[in-house]
Amino acid sequence: MEGVFSIMKNISRSAAAVLALSSMLTCAYSCSKSSGSDDSSTAPTTQVITTEPVNLGNPMEITWLADYDLNPQSPNEERPAALAAFEDNYGGKVKYIQTSSGEMLTKLSEMLNAGEEVDMFPYDTSAVPSGVMRNQFAPLDDVYDELGMNISGLWDDMKGTIESYSYNGKHYVIPYKLSSPFMITYSRKLMQEEELADPYELYQNDQWNWDIFMEMMEKFTSKVPPLSRYGITGDFGQALLQSTGKNVVLYDGKKFSSNLSDPSIEKAELLMQDIAAKSLYNPKWKSSFPNNGATLFFASKDWSLAESNANNPDMDLMVVPFPKATDADKYCITCDINAKMLVANSKKAKGVATYIMCERYAAKDQKYLDAAKQRALTAKNSLLGTPEAFITEEQYDAIQSYLDTSKFTPANDFAYGMGEKMHSYGEYTYDTRGAMENLTTALLEPAEPVDTWEKLRDYVKPVIDKEIEAFNK
């Protein structure tokens, strides 16, 4: 791929600092710190570029409200590449206001109502449309220049994802990176012992679909008495539903509508029903791939993989995306969206946009990507020197490929942003969960009051219809 920085030609003088930013990011994770490091040969730092900063106004400080700080927590801690670029190349600063994850939205509302300064806020699914309708966030369309949207090669692969978040003709969410995909972990050794095909090879040959997935689980569990083996455990209801490529709530740019009756959604729900009815699913919580040889697949985000490897060092684990619907032409991936929101009434829109652009550069710069890979592949060892957590290079490269938007469509259903009646875990019961949680959980879990798609559909339909009506007013 042609380097994003090599193709920025004939840019205006106002974008000169952008070019310098690329130089700084390429060394942000390859130069050693000048002091305070335990290992000066590997500890990264940044290089200050002597280019005139872009004028963001005075002061150039933006206020960040979140449950985590973007700034280093100690003098010895390296700055993230995006923050280093924002500070060194643009003269920016990030002022942190701490709050808890459960209180962030409440704190934001309190600050807005009090007229207190807050500029930037973490993205989560409640931002659009709920947060926008509560006048908590502002669109970023007026600061596209500061975002670098016109720089060839910088945002090209994210433009489809960005457009999927467009609301009322405006862009409130500008994802700069995808991460943490839902995926399936399996053991190649176990597959060979059971004379089953390698799912990764099936995926590479475009044969990894629901039908093959079910056939493998049924064959695996049929060899011993029922309930002794399981086809799958972990968290996969949402990934299965979204592998259809269909949304529960549709948006045409003006109005929302229910898509609950879509045949693909019905097929996904019937598949969950079938998995539960055939006792293929083990609902008992697991934090990693089971090491007893009694489960074929483990579904989770990528956070579990390092522990799974450590607990199964001889099982040759590998990961694949969730299988696509049998009649689908493309894989749809459920993953995290990395974005920062511009808070309503902020006077620092250009500063927030410039920070987001720095995040995008950090997500694209090859030196940064190489350093991130090196960190991910560094095993964490116990005091005895045995691996406690590790990821192989093959696994890492595969995960990154599953986030490639030319091969996968990132799922985005506005239903998850339409309030607690639609998206909430409640008290983890059928009566307190949101409609989306019941759609992705109820037919899989034991002792739920519904055991068929028809009953579940009739229960969630009026909830979905009522919330859509409220948002369309």
Show where each model-derived region lies:
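Conserved N-terminal structural module of periplasmic/extracytoplasmic solute-binding proteins
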Residues: 5, 10-17, 28-134, 363-371, ...
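Hinge/lid segment of periplasmic solute-binding proteins
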Residues: 44-58, 102, 125-181, 211, ...
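Short helix-initiation/N-cap motifs at beta->coil->alpha
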Residues: 98-107, 206-212, 282-291
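Paired acidic/hydrophobic, glycine-rich loop segments that form the ligand-binding mouth/hinge
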Residues: 119-122, 295-301
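Extracytoplasmic/periplasmic solute-binding protein
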Residues: 121, 166-184, 192, 206-257
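Short, solvent-exposed loop/beta-turn-alpha elements that line the ligand-binding surface or hinge
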Residues: 141-156, 202-205, 247-267, 325-331
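Glycine-centered hinge/linker elements that transmit conformational signals in sensory
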Residues: 216-217, 251-284
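Extracytoplasmic/periplasmic substrate-recognition and gating elements
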Residues: 310-382
